Amino acid sequence: MLRQLLLAALCLAGPPAPARACQLPSEWRPLSEGCRAELAETIVYARVLALHPEAPGLYNHLPWQYHAGQGGLFYSAEVEMLCDQAWGSMLEVPAGSRLNLTGLGYFSCHSHTVVQDYSYFFFLRMDENYNLLPHGVNFQDAIFPDTQENRRMFSSLFQFSNCSQGQQLATFSSDWEIQEDSRLMCSSVQKALFEEEDHVKKLQQKVATLEKRNRQLRERVKKVKRSLRQARKKGRHLELANQKLSEKLAAGALPHINARGPVRPPYLRG
């Protein structure tokens, strides 16, 4: 199975076709692990006992044609809880319990992959049929390998207790209460950021509307100025024509130098 998974990963590592491109929301922004941990429904620390292949279904599908020969793309995992569930979780199961996780494999925008006999931190959610699925908050990773860095991060964010022998996480959480008291909740900060971004978008829309109206007003002012210039030019032409006409009329009213004078009345003698 591991060989099949590696082969599938190599196949998917090639350049994707245009129809296979991952489409994320235009307003998408990456979130940190700590922020996504606050938004995840459930966090468990468990070891993978076995892997089982799965056929394409509601939670296992690809945007391109799936062929029967592409085995190993989708699978489920049987895991064993290494610690009691983190506080604040809706999933209440003790250490040593075994769970089945579905919805694992290689997808268009992300991959939820695990290896048998290895331990991981899982972000999980439960669907309406009580199936446990990876909770890919913000379209990002939902499975984290068992490393010292991840142990330190998750033990400072969540309270694990009653872990199996050799799996104690409490050694990293000496300052957990201090961090929890002084840390702003990421969800509220994220909400405030979203609201601020929405406000900025609305302001940008208003600015764009005002700029459009300003351009329209400028065009109207240009047209009015052009009409005014044409009216002034036409007025000057009319004034010049009127002046010439007046001069012609004035010239027609004066007697000509060769014209006969007015006829005098006859002289009467007494």
Curated annotation (Swiss-Prot):
Transmembrane segments: none annotated. One of its GO terms (biological process) is negative regulation of lipid metabolic process. Induction: Up-regulated by pioglitazone and down-regulated by TNF in HUVEC. It is found in: Secreted. Keywords: Coiled coil, Glycoprotein, Secreted, Signal. Residues 188-251 form a coiled coil. InterPro entries: CCDC3 (IPR040311). Residues 1-21 form the signal peptide. GO terms for cellular component: endoplasmic reticulum; extracellular region. Expressed in umbilical vein endothelial cells (HUVEC), and at lower levels in aortic smooth muscle cells (HASMC). Its main location: secreted. Glycans are attached at N100. PANTHER family: COILED-COIL DOMAIN-CONTAINING PROTEIN 3. Homodimer. Negatively regulates TNF-alpha-induced pro-inflammatory response in endothelial cells (ECs) via inhibition of TNF-alpha-induced NF-kappaB activation in ECs. Positively regulates lipid accumulation in adipose cells. This is Coiled-coil domain-containing protein 3. The lineage of its organism: Eukaryota, Metazoa, Chordata, Craniata, Vertebrata.
